[in-house]
Curated annotation (Swiss-Prot):
It comes from Penaeus vannamei (Whiteleg shrimp). One of its GO terms (biological process) is defense response to bacterium. This is Penaeidin-3i. Antibacterial and antifungal activity. Presents chitin-binding activity. It comes from the Eukaryota.
Length: 82
C-alpha cells in the first residue's frame, strides 16, 4: 500500500513539474528579434570598391527597412543573410 501511495505521489509531482496539470497562468517570455547592425546607405548590400561592405552608418529603422525591402540583413556576430 505504501508503494502505491508513493508511486501516485511521484506521478502527480512529475505532472506538476512538467506543467501538465497547471496549464494556465504561466506565460513564457517573448523572444526578442535578433539585433541589427547598421548597413551602409545606398543600394543593396554588396561589394564596395572590390571589398565587402561592413554594417555601419545608418539608423536602426533604415537598417530594418533595407532588410525588409531588399532581403539583405545584417545581424550582430553573424554577418549578412539574404
Amino acid at each position: 500500500m505504501r508503494l502505491v501511495v508513493c508511486l501516485v505521489f511521484l506521478a502527480s509531482f512529475a505532472l506538476v513539474c512538467q506543467g501538465q496539470v497547471y496549464k494556465g497562468g504561466y506565460t513564457r517570455p517573448i523572444p526578442r528579434p535578433p539585433p541589427f547592425v547598421r548597413p551602409l546607405p545606398g543600394g543593396p548590400i554588396g561589394p564596395y570598391n572590390g571589398r565587402p561592405v561592413s554594417c555601419r552608418g545608418i539608423s536602426f529603422s533604415q537598417a530594418r527597412s533595407c532588410c525588409s525591402r531588399l532581403g539583405r540583413c545584417c545581424h550582430v556576430g553573424k554577418g549578412y543573410s539574404g
